Design a protein with these regions (language model features):
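Membrane-embedded alpha-helical bundles that constitute the cytochrome b-like, heme-associated redox core
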Residues: 1-237
Length: 237
């Protein structure tokens, strides 16, 4: 239920803040970095409860960043002339960078090598799926850094257009790894009877499964549009 609430809040945030973010992107990025810095500080040290509770709710388990990426994902499969695409597509780059920043802290915390080694030793035999999930998190961190850095406009302008497009296609691998990571982290709890874990697995599967279907459908439609229609020959011409 927690993720579903954050997802609905993320959709509302993107709808109302998209135009503002496009105009004042730096301010949003600074705010996201500040939130991540507070999250990491709270994880390694401590924060007052009135600060830690909302930050933990939003940032822990990367739920807010993932929810924003879900919006970015779906904007790409809606028809360009749809109301949703017309409102959000112009700000898609800024939204993706904002989501990217909000994911960095969580993945960094998970993939600090001493921490990963400690978890692997403690859970390696009892919960191997969780250990694999941490390894996938490391892959996600690498993909996130590459995709995030190349999303900045000044980096995009400095790159060859074909190379930039090829790099951005890695986003599909990032989305797939995100789903795999979540499943590896929640399925063990679901197997042991956690209703919350079962619900989370169901919601993520529904969202990412729907995206996969819509993405394939759009790709087929784009391919059909790009294929020239042969004109019938006129008899006697």
């Amino acid at each position: 239920m927690k993720y579903l609430i954050i997802q609905l809040l993320a959709v509302a945030f993107c709808w109302f803040a998209a135009r503002s973010m496009r105009k004042h992107a730096i301010a949003y990025y600074v705010g996201a970095f500040a939130l991540e810095a507070l999250f990491l500080y709270g994880k390694f040290f401590s924060l007052p409860g009135f600060l830690w509770t909302p930050i933990f709710f939003a940032v822990d388990q990367c739920m807010l960043g993932t929810a924003l990426f879900v919006v970015v994902m779906f904007v790409g499969v809606f028809p360009k002339n749809s109301p949703i695409a017309q409102r959000l597509r112009p700000s898609r780059g800024e939204l993706s960078i904002f989501a990217w920043i909000l994911c960095l802290g969580h993945l960094f915390y998970l993939t600090v090598i001493p921490r990963m080694a400690d978890i692997a030793i403690r859970l390696g035999f009892a919960m191997p799926m969780t250990v694999v999930g941490l390894i996938v998190a490391l892959i996600l961190l690498v993909l996130l850094i590459v995709l995030g850095v190349t999303s900045f406009k000044f980096v995009k302008r400095a790159m060859n257009a074909a190379t930039w497009k090829a790099v951005q296609r890695w986003s599909y691998l990032f989305y797939a790894c995100t789903y795999i990571h979540v499943m590896l982290m929640v399925v063990p709890s679901a197997v042991y009877g956690s209703g919350q874990a079962v619900f989370t697995a169901f919601v993520y599967t529904a969202i990412f499964g729907s995206y996969a279907v819509l993405r394939v459908k759009r790709a087929l439609a784009e391919k059909a549009e790009a294929t020239p229609v042969a004109k019938p020959e006129v008899a006697g011409a």
